Swiss-Prot record:
Protein localization: Nucleus
Pfam families: At2g31720-like
Annotated PANTHER family: B3 DOMAIN PLANT PROTEIN-RELATED, TF-B3 DOMAIN-CONTAINING PROTEIN
UniProt region (Disordered), positions on chain: 76-179
Any GO MF annotation of the entry: DNA binding
Species whose genome carries this gene: Arabidopsis thaliana
Biased composition range(s): Polar residues: 76-99, 134-143
Name recorded for this polypeptide: B3 domain-containing protein At1g32030
UniProt superkingdom: Eukaryota
Taxonomic lineage from the root: Eukaryota, Viridiplantae, Streptophyta, Embryophyta, Tracheophyta
InterPro entries listed in its UniProt record: At2g31720-like (IPR005508), B3_DNA-bd (IPR003340), DNA-bd_pseudobarrel_sf (IPR015300)
Main location: nucleus
Length: 333
């Protein structure tokens, strides 16, 4: 009897424990379902939002890829520790200029507060200026005093200093003094050249001139030598002089040889040319033509160049010859 009772009790306990376990399992499943049901919309929403943001980023990336990007070079800035300290001090100084959060009380005078702020800001500014310009011996207060003095007492335009300045500005620049061979010996190269050409007479300085624009123009093709500006006019023989006076053709004249500083010989013609003016009066001139353009080009002659013409005779027949002489270098003048 007792054995049957014990077996029945054990079976009952087993059924109770198995039913309790099933109930616990069912309760845990129901709790999990409820929690999962609450979290599912949140996960879905978060996934949708993440997907939307990803699509927006990809869209922006595709949009900016349409434009070329500018390459930027890497710049390495080496900062000076002293400069950093000055910057920090400048920041602290500028921050002390005006504190907007400081509101004066009802008992304080706004004008006194404003005056204090202005005085502190001006002193800070002057301190910064003095620190930035340590090499300047004058202080900022001296500069302000000088500025106020200049504004109060402007310079007098009629003072002696101002008049001297105006006079110096209005004075024309001195013209270049042309080089002259007067009273000087003939250049050495010309003397040697006469020796090789069997010179029999000369050399003689007959003319000096600062070249004009017409003297170097290819259209004119002549060197004009006014008769009244000749240094000497006895370089022609009576026969040559009569030929020049009798000839009326512009292309005829007395044949001669011209030697340049490079010791190159050129065939030229000396011609008489009468220049008539609007007043009716005329002037007599000698002109070296027929080959003058080649001489200008070979010797690179330009307007305002100083030249001199020398005459000499060569050979047994005393053929008329000229020499083109330029000023010597400055160190030999």
């Amino acid at each position: 009897m007792s054995t049957y009772y014990n077996d029945h009790l054990a079976a009952a306990e087993k059924d109770i424990s198995s039913s309790n376990f099933c109930n616990l399992v069912d309760a845990s499943v129901m709790l999990y379902d409820e929690e999962h049901r609450d979290l599912l919309p949140k996960k879905v929403n978060s996934r949708c939002q993440a997907k939307t943001k990803k699509q927006e980023k990809e869209s922006d990336k595709r949009f900016f890829d349409l434009f070329p990007k500018k390459r930027r070079t890497s710049v390495v800035t080496v900062r000076n520790p002293e400069q950093n300290q000055q910057n920090l001090h400048r920041v602290s100084t500028s921050s002390s200029l005006l504190d907007l959060n400081t509101i004066p009380g009802d008992s304080s005078d706004p004008r006194n507060e404003l005056q204090g702020l202005l005085s502190s800001s001006s002193s800070s500014f002057l301190g910064d200026y003095e620190r930035k310009t340590p090499q300047n011996a004058s202080s900022s207060s001296t500069l302000l005093a000088e500025y106020n003095t200049e504004m109060a007492n402007p310079p007098n335009p009629n003072s002696e200093t101002s008049l001297k300045r105006k006079h110096s500005d209005s004075e024309p620049k001195k013209a270049k003094t042309p080089y002259s061979w007067k009273g000087r010996e003939a250049p050495e190269w010309l003397v040697k050249m006469m020796g090789t050409m069997q010179g029999s007479e000369g050399p003689r300085l007959i003319y000096e001139k600062t070249l004009t624009e017409t003297d170097v123009k290819p259209v004119q093709s002549r060197l004009l030598m006014p008769f009244n500006t000749l240094i000497r006019n006895d370089f022609l023989t009576p026969v040559e002089l009569r030929i020049l006076l009798e000839l009326e053709d512009d292309t005829d004249g007395v044949g001669a040889t011209l030697v340049d500083p490079w010791e190159v010989k050129w065939g030229v013609i000396l011609k008489k040319r009468e220049m008539k003016k609007y007043s009716g009066k005329g002037s007599l001139n000698y002109a070296i033509i027929c080959g003058w353009n080649d001489i200008v080009e070979a010797n690179v002659l330009e307007k305002d160049d100083d030249i001199s013409i020398w005459s000499f005779r060569r050979g047994r027949n005393g053929i008329l010859s000229f020499a083109l002489v330029l000023p010597p270098p400055p160190d030999m003048a």
